[in-house]
Amino acid sequence: MALSKVKLNDTLNKDQLLSSSKYTIQRSTGDNIDTPNYDVQKHLNKLCGMLLITEDANHKFTGLIGMLYAMSRLGREDTIKILKDAGYHVKANGVDITTYRQDINGKEMKFEVLTLSSLTSEIQVNIEIESRKSYKKMLKEMGEVAPEYRHDSPDCGMIILCIAALVITKLAAGDRSGLTAVIRRANNVLKNEIKRYKGLIPKDIANSFYEVFEKHPHLIDVFVHFGIAQSSTRGGSRVEGIFAGLFMNAYGSGQVMLRWGVLAKSVKNIMLGHASVQAEMEQVVEVYEYAQKLGGEAGFYHILNNPKASLLSLTQFPNFSSVVLGNAAGLGIMGEYRGTPRNQDLYDAAKAYAEQLKENGVINYSVLDLTAEELEAIKNQLNPKEDDVEL
């Protein structure tokens, strides 16, 4: 489908239709959902840390524990509100710390565990037992374990949630085809943390989050709102800064999805965040202004704040059903455009981007479905070499 066949007014009509709905639906989150409050946040962070210090850790439950930690940062009331606002019928289970006794080698031992419906006390105890084995090994090797290598380091939970931020961007594929990219990116941005913790295995943790988001889609809504809240909070640790960068890259693509002229209002579509618009600068400006009307939380976050940074490579999106707004801006410059732009900043950013693409020689004109007039306009504005124009 050519980009020029998609009309913005179709999108606006659908937006009006969706906005006029008088009814809502209720989804079920299951029998019970654990909603931990701030008071158990430290314990959940420590549980994350136990998994991180455990050599060859079993990360089957890491995604779930990471999400419980995220909820504890939001707080019980806000977590429940997020779920209800998203249309979920919530049966909330409060979470407390309790003492659990277990016989180990003929000796009764006491453990502090959380009253979770989603994670048994036995599993929590097993995580602690395995982490103690690794901790003893660390003591032998180091003599003394520095705070940043311990299981109770305050950034343990956020380290795990950094991988969740990478996974959330890949859910749109409907499978786990993005896993390789997640692993590669995690190995890069979390390289210092990987040196700290032998149990920080990006592949296993990413698979655990894939599992959680696939089985419990309501947690996607929770995570997105957590990410917004976390990223908008000033200060914080180095890892919190890394998380904000990773999450905003995903969120910035646009929570409101314009795809094949259809508007999908759902936080689950942030990772799809692609705009298909008419290949004319006028249309691009209309979409830009439409995004401004909806506001930052409705999507296009980074486009509203930094248009130039949003202009991604056209060659990454050969299918016109997935051209991001910034690409459309660039295409508007390369295509035929007459008149004075209504948004000079956006026009200048798009023009600079298009010219940079030309200078780097990475524009593949064969995927643009350009008319003869548009090709002529490209020659006039960008002066490409003949061999750059592939038909």
Curated annotation (Swiss-Prot):
It holds the Pfam family Pneumo_ncap. Residues 31-252, 244-290, 338-364 are annotated as: Interaction with the phosphoprotein. Homomultimerizes to form the nucleocapsid. Binds to viral genomic RNA. Interacts (via N-terminus) with the phosphoprotein P (via C-terminus); the phosphorylated phosphoprotein P binds to N-RNA complex. When in a monomeric RNA-free form, interacts with the phosphoprotein (via N-terminus). Interacts with protein M2-1; this interaction allows the association of nucleocapsid with the matrix protein. Interacts with host EIF2AK2/PKR; this interaction inhibits EIF2AK2 phosphorylation of EIF2S1 and blocks EIF2AK2-mediated translation shutoff. Belongs to the paramyxoviruses nucleocapsid family. InterPro entries: Pneumo_ncap (IPR004930). Keywords: Capsid protein, Helical capsid protein, Host cytoplasm, Host-virus interaction, Inhibition of host innate immune response by virus, Inhibition of host interferon signaling pathway by virus, Inhibition of host MAVS by virus, Inhibition of host MDA5 by virus, Inhibition of host NF-kappa-B by virus, Inhibition of host PKR by virus, Inhibition of host RLR pathway by virus, Interferon antiviral system evasion, Phosphoprotein, Ribonucleoprotein, RNA-binding, Viral immunoevasion, Viral nucleoprotein, Virion. This is Nucleoprotein. GO terms for cellular component: helical viral capsid; host cell cytoplasm; ribonucleoprotein complex; viral nucleocapsid. Tyrosine phosphorylation modulates viral transcription and replication. Encapsidates the viral RNA genome by forming a left-handed helical nucleocapsid that protects the RNA from nucleases. RNA replication depends on the availability of soluble nucleoprotein. The encapsidated genomic RNA is termed the NC and serves as template for transcription and replication. Together with the phosphoprotein, sequesters host NF-kappa-B in inclusion bodies (IBs) thereby inhibiting this host defense pathway. May also act as a modulator of the innate immune response by sequestration of host IFIH1/MDA5 and MAVS into IBs. It is found in: Virion; Host cytoplasm. It comes from Human respiratory syncytial virus B (strain B1). It comes from the Viruses. GO terms for molecular function: protein serine/threonine kinase inhibitor activity; RNA binding. GO terms for biological process: symbiont-mediated suppression of host cytoplasmic pattern recognition receptor signaling pathway via inhibition of MAVS activity; symbiont-mediated suppression of host cytoplasmic pattern recognition receptor signaling pathway via inhibition of MDA-5 activity; symbiont-mediated suppression of host NF-kappaB cascade; symbiont-mediated suppression of host PKR/eIFalpha signaling; symbiont-mediated suppression of host type I interferon-mediated signaling pathway. The modification Phosphotyrosine is found at Y38.
